[in-house]
Regions:
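Polar, enzyme-active/binding microenvironments
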Residues: 1-190
Length: 190
């Protein structure tokens, strides 16, 4: 899908990715998980973002993704924060959390059933959550901010290299994505 930059363009760094300014810049991804998803389903989904840098501060409202309040559902990843706590939502309204050491890397949320979801940071699995799925949220995914009922919010300064959404991935598949990107970044000297 296409990336449509907002009127207040985020910064793009070659071989790194996009970052917002924390107040007004963000990306609109021309991808609505409720209508464009060939493989993403209510109880079979993964959503991942690779963060090159984390935003400053510990604001819990930072976001990337989409929130549809009428459906009570989010497909949303908070960027890593100094509190070493990753938070996100995958077709649900209750938070899924994973504590970890560090503040950058691949953050992936996966749902494999109506009450089975988990977060991974890089290749480390978090506790499996029993948060129940409610709906696949409708609205384009935003990065460097979140789409909250069609409006940007939760702006942040974290730098994002890539994002993916689709069918639920296994732990091994997520580890393969991480290893491939890590090898690429090492090969180009980053």
């Amino acid at each position: 899908h296409d990336i449509t930059e907002s009127a207040t363009n985020p910064t793009f760094d070659d071989f790194q990715g996009y970052s917002g300014n924390g107040t007004s810049s963000y990306l609109i991804i021309d991808y609505n998980p409720a209508t464009d998803a060939d493989n993403l389903a209510l109880d079979d989904a993964s959503f991942g973002i690779y963060f090159i840098t984390a935003p400053s501060g510990t604001h819990p409202g930072y976001g990337n993704g989409v929130y549809e309040s009428d459906a009570g559902s989010r497909l949303w990843i908070n960027p890593a924060r100094s509190a070493d706590l990753e938070r996100g939502y995958i077709n649900n309204a209750s938070v899924i959390e994973r504590t970890f050491t560090g503040s950058v890397g691949l953050v992936t949320l996966t749902r494999t059933g109506s009450t089975t979801a988990y977060a991974m940071v890089n290749k480390v699995l978090g506790t499996v959550s029993e948060v129940e799925s409610v709906a696949v949220p409708s609205g384009d995914i935003y990065l460097c901010a979140a789409n909250i009922d069609g409006n940007p919010g939760g702006y942040h300064t974290g730098e994002i290299s890539f994002v993916f959404a689709g069918k639920g991935l296994t732990e091994a598949q997520i580890a393969d994505i991480y290893d491939c990107f890590d090898a690429y970044m090492t090969a180009i000297g980053n």
